Design a protein with these regions (language model features):
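Short, conserved recognition motifs on repeat-domain binding surfaces
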Residues: 1-416
Length: 416
């Protein structure tokens, strides 16, 4: 491999998906490994010397590539055959590129007919035009884990996509059969990298009484090693029902439940747990097993941040449950919630039209909060205990009722 040494050069990336300009709609399904990268030399009369780095051992090449930002790694993969082989090698993706997962990235999308959006690099604090390999709607259930993201169409509940957004590799699973028509369903997803497997959980709730007090609950577990859905755990709940929020953390399934008794405000939300190692359903759905929420909540979300179960939600008013007075973050400590922080009022006001419905997603050290009505994204760093805004996204609102949403994930180069 030869590099031509000149006074200066530039990289031209025509049609690249990793672009700071308008997205290229002609690269659907082509992945993010850029094929059109060109090294453009300045046309001048100065003497140029060719320098070969082919004599360098592979481990030096790997160390050079592993120091690059993620977007630059994809571009470098197209410079020469050797670098392309290294970037795609299992050794590089499993070892040298582990630093890529230190900070989660955020993908923002809208109610568009195209699978396009913007991807936020939290390390470089930069947005990229980005495209998923399939169309995702804001009503879909989305669950990330270790670089992979699970998507479930909540309208049809027929298919689940397991995708690496960075490499655009994905596989599709059929949903397990349901014993009835589910009113609510919750998706959870967990990757075990040491054993190269993943687990999917779907919790379904079906109405069992006209007064909405009794609910039939089914828990479906998929093991990728066996490539099969286990027999569902079935049971009933009185006075509580699962919603659309669940999480897997350290082989424990956490399910956010809602009180179905009238005039209940303070304890409107709760949490139940199910051990995925023992598969013992006894007592899981009993009322005495419910862990009360820290306060009246709206738009509660569970997420795994710093290897802990974290709850993010709007802090409701006791007299007006649909109105929030702020947004809080809590960590589960045993069977109690410990408050970490509340969003400062200046940031609440910065959202403008932030109401009781908003999106939140977290992983690694970062928690992302976004209003469904706009593109502003606020980040809370659990490590530094600081709030800060994302750089302004170039996505614009095209009509008044347009809905924006997003999710975070760890950028990785390998599928498993």
């Amino acid at each position: 491999m030869l590099f031509w040494v000149t006074d200066s050069f530039s990289l031209s990336v025509p049609g690249a998906s990793w672009s700071d300009d308008e997205s290229d709609t002609n690269r659907k399904g082509s992945g993010v490994f850029l094929l059109n990268l060109e090294l453009i030399e300045n046309d001048n009369n100065q003497e140029e010397n060719s320098v070969s780095i082919d004599i360098l051992p592979d481990d030096i090449h790997e160390r050079i590539l592993s120091r690059l930002p993620l977007s630059a790694i994809f571009k470098a993969a197209c410079v020469c055959k050797k670098w392309n082989q290294i970037v795609h090698s299992k050794k590089f993706t499993l070892t040298d590129a582990n630093f890529l997962s230190e900070k989660t990235w955020y993908f923002m999308f809208t109610s568009s007919a195209e699978p396009v959006g913007y991807l936020y690099d939290s390390g470089l604090r930069k947005w990229y035009n980005f495209e998923l390999p399939f169309l995702v709607h804001h009503t879909w259930k989305i669950a990330p884990s270790c670089g992979l993201v699970s998507f479930m169409d909540d309208e049809t509940c027929k298919k689940i996509h397991i995708c690496n957004p960075i490499t655009r590799e994905y596989e599709t699973l059929k949903n397990p059969p349901s014993p009835g028509f589910p009113v609510y369903s919750a998706l959870a997803f967990s990757v075990d990298q040491s054993n190269s497997k993943y687990t999917i959980s779907i919790v379904r709730a079906m109405q069992a009484s006209e007064d909405f007090l009794s609910w039939l609950v089914s828990i479906h577990i998929y093991n990728s090693k066996e490539k099969t859905w286990l027999p569902p755990v079935m049971g009933g709940m009185e006075g509580w029902r699962p919603g659309d929020v669940s999480l897997i953390c350290d082989n424990i399934l956490y399910i956010l439940v809602f009180c179905t008794r009238p005039n209940e405000v303070q304890n409107f939300h709760g949490l139940i747990t199910y051990n995925l190692e023992t598969f013992n359903p006894i007592g899981v759905l009993k009322e005495e097993s419910v862990i009360s929420a820290p306060c009246a909540l709206t738009c509660g979300r569970l997420m795994k941040v710093q290897r802990q179960v974290v709850l993010v939600g709007g802090i409701g008013r006791a007299d007006r449950p649909g109105v929030i007075k702020g947004i809080g973050i809590w960590v589960l400590n045993g069977k109690e919630w410990k408050e970490v922080t509340r969003m400062p009022q200046k940031f609440v006001q910065g959202f403008g039209e932030l109401d009781d419905v908003f999106a939140s997603s977290g992983g690694g050290d970062l928690i992302y909060i976004q209003s469904y009505g706009g593109t502003a994204v606020l980040i809370y760093d659990m490590d530094t205990r600081q709030w800060f805004w994302c750089q302004k996204c170039q996505m614009h609102k095209k009509f008044p009722l347009e809905i924006f949403s997003g999710f975070c994930f760890e950028p990785r180069l390998q599928f498993m």
